[in-house]
């Protein structure tokens, strides 16, 4: 069993391992899930992202993790924290959080449950001073969720990314400080 990093009431968040790419390709790489994330990816692209995440954990002690549903043992998504590594972003090196939930598990509170745990982990265990999250204005569900987490819109961090559909530009960012989180903390699945 890969290393468990975080455990919540319904989820296990564990480190990504090489064999996870095929599972993510099959279950998370759908047109609906990937619509505002640059579209469906090739398996080699997912493998490259997984390799990056494994190296982040080895080098910095954090990265993205697979979300495993305790009741079924099934993959329901992935989430975590990484460094902003898009060279077009004005804040390269900041700590960025992100999430992805399988389409048939939407609206069950898994994003909220996992990200509340990830944010606690980032501030309390890793010791980051603040977090950012990146999305597009078109991805209203994503930025509304960022607001629900207590994050604030940061127009000064917007940037254009030609790798994405023009409808998904500019990339927009939200941020959350440790102090904000202390007053905004999640209360559980919603």
Residue spans of the language-model regions?
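Short loop/turn motifs at secondary-structure junctions and domain boundaries
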Residues: 56-60
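Short coil/turn segments at beta-strand junctions that form active-site/ligand-binding loops
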Residues: 61-63, 129
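Acyl-donor (CoA/ACP) binding surface of acyl/acetyltransferases
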Residues: 1-36, 68-190
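Conserved GNAT-fold acetyl-CoA-binding loop/helix
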Residues: 32-52, 63-65
